[in-house]
Amino acid sequence: MYSFVSEETGTLIVNSVLLFLAFVVFLLVTLAILTALRLCAYCCNIVNVSLVKPTVYVYSRVKNLNSSEGVPDLLV
């Protein structure tokens, strides 16, 4: 049977291809993790804007109104 390349060259080519594929898989996994973290940060921002900030605003507004009118802190 005829061989176009030597065994050492064939092994080097196969190892290079496998190393390249491992690098591509590593990049895909890294990209997936970064995308998941970005989605998590986006969802946390939605929760912050829609729930936390209005609550803090209402709390501070009521506290300021109570302190300016001399009413005891019954509403807070």
From Swiss-Prot:
Subcellular compartments: Host endoplasmic reticulum-Golgi intermediate compartment; Host Golgi apparatus membrane
Family the entry assigns: Belongs to the betacoronaviruses E protein family.
GN (gene name): E
An example molecular function term from Gene Ontology annotations: identical protein binding
Stated name of the protein: Envelope small membrane protein
A Pfam family it matches: CoV_E
Protein source organism: Severe acute respiratory syndrome coronavirus (SARS-CoV)
Transmembrane segments: 17-37
Membrane topology type: Single-pass type III membrane protein
Lineage of the species this protein comes from: Viruses, Riboviria, Orthornavirae, Pisuviricota, Pisoniviricetes
Renumbered ranges of motif PDZ-binding: 73-76
Topological domain spans for side Intravirion: 38-76
Record topological domains on the Virion surface side: 1-16
